[in-house]
Amino acid sequence: MIIIPNDEANEPFVKDALMDSSMTFRKVNLYGKSLFITNYSSTDVEYIPIKDATVIPDGLYSRKVKQESTFVTVGNVKIGSGKLVVAAGPCAVESDEQLMEIGERVKELGADMLRGGAFKPRTTPYSFQGLGMKGINMMKKVSESTGLPTVSEIMDISDYKHFEGNIDMLQVGSRNSQNFSLLRFLGQREVPVLLKNGMGNTISEWLNSAEYILSGGNGNVVMCYRGVRSFEDSTRFMMDSGAVPVLRERSHLPVCADPSHPAGKREYVETLAMAAVASGADMLEIEVHNNPDKALSDAKQQLDFNGFSRLIKNVRKLKEIVG
């Protein structure tokens, strides 16, 4: 349950009423507002003499709490401010030379951010698992050289010490989208979070994952749609372009789309990216490699520089049309 004082002057009275009720609650500051959060139900709250406050069952992500769209700042980039943001880079960081070449080229071609995996959640333990801290250091080095803010996936709370101060935005991948311990932990930090949907999540379940972060006081959340698993195997996952407008209607949070993973094959990535932009995505996350066929992970879906050049030109043109 979320209780929002209608006026800053009413905050002490709301707090006193909750304390007098012996109800367990906590105060959170989010988007310039003071909120009181309790695990009690709306029925319980009805009997508390709270005046001049809005009571909602849940949904810090919803437009009931914040009507205007949120934008999230990552380095010198604003996601959700009206300009299409494109994050590009390899699925996995493989070497200093590889990452520097990719970082310089994607910036030259118009990318706003550098993506790259240092800790890799792979389906089998025998696949390349990433370079770990070495990869993080490489990301920071290329970021400092190119000026591109970075986004990289965090898999475990214990790894946060490696990311802090080195990576600008933390990605929570599909497999961790309901890792509630990790989500709560990130809610206690101010770091921007790119939250992907789980392979079998409904939109409501995914938004509730965002709620774990928001309810800790961290409002810097971007929702990233990466498709869901279905019976169809022509593509790696099913990308429902209807998910983006539904998210924009139900939530004030910025929406990113990852067309690389649902495509599974590079020839489909641009088309899915165009569909995401046409449906209202604020951001795209694209896998790009200097030698895709030799990539250590997700080789089939990574674009080469020519493919990325064509994609980014076309999505920028489309964004100008759809606004």
Task: Name these PLM-found stretches.
Residues 5, 57-87, 320-323:
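N-terminal amphipathic alpha-helix/helix-capping segment at the start of soluble metabolic enzymes
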Residues 73-91, 122-125, 248-257:
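N-terminal small/glycine-rich loop or linker at the start of catalytic domains
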Residues 74, 189-288:
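Catalytic alpha/beta core domains of metabolic enzymes, predominantly
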Residues 84-101, 125-129, 149-153, 174, ...:
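Active-site mouth loops of central-metabolism enzymes
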Residues 84-90, 112-116, 150-152, 170-172, ...:
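Hydrophobic faces of well-ordered beta-strands that scaffold small-molecule active sites
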Residues 115-133, 290-300:
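Glycine-rich, proline-tolerant flexible connector loops at the mouths of alpha/beta enzymes
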Residues 128-152, 186-192, 241-256, 301-323:
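Alpha-helix-loop-beta-strand connector modules within alpha/beta enzyme cores
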Residues 131, 148-156, 168-181, 191-203, ...:
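Catalytic beta/alpha-barrel core
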